[in-house]
């Protein structure tokens, strides 16, 4: 597969750059969430940052070296509140899965690069999940439901692992004394 001079080559580089920048932005957003007392949201930004790194690596591997010239625009320079960051992240993810990667996949298909088209399409599926998760977190923060729910649940301390039952997380962990920010709804997914 020789991409040299193709639009697919440019699209791969744009996707690589975009994913790399999203990864870094998400690490900044994770720090902000932690400062605001949202340990789980911070961890979700960090997890998503790792996903973006892997997406960047997939696009990078397709390129196979060389120099590619292109002009592109990327969001820069703003770290807002956790809610603002979640909204910005959701918008970026929506652009990727809703427009960018489907279009890039179509171009790759038309130019005879079905493997690259498949990569764009499967990564788009992940980005759709990221957008849904970010939007759900915005809703949870805005409704004051990060640490308080309408039903009885189990809450797990992310620091020491204590699991307690209640409609809201304790103000502090009775075991390790870490603040409420370290609690998340406990889910057994194994």
Where are these regions (language model features)?
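Non-heme di-metal
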Residues: 1-190
């Amino acid at each position: 597969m020789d991409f040299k001079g193709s639009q697919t080559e440019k699209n791969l580089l744009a996707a690589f750059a975009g994913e790399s920048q999203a990864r870094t932005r998400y690490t900044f957003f994770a720090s902000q969430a932690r400062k605001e007392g949202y340990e789980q949201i911070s961890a979700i930004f960090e997890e998503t940052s790792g996903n973006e790194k892997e997406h960047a690596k997939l696009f990078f591997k397709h390129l196979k070296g060389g120099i590619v010239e292109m002009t592109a625009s990327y969001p820069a320079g703003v770290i807002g509140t956790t809610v603002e960051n979640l909204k910005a992240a959701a918008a970026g993810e929506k652009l990727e899965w809703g427009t960018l990667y489907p279009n890039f996949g179509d171009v790759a298909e038309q130019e005879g690069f079905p493997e690259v088209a498949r990569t764009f399409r499967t990564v788009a599926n992940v980005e759709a999940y990221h957008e849904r998760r970010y939007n759900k977190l915005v809703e949870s923060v805005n409704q004051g439901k990060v640490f308080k729910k309408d039903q009885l649940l189990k809450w797990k301390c992310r620091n020491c692992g204590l699991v307690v039952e209640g409609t809201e997380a304790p103000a502090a962990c009775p075991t390790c004394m870490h603040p409420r920010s370290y609690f998340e709804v406990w889910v057994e997914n194994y």
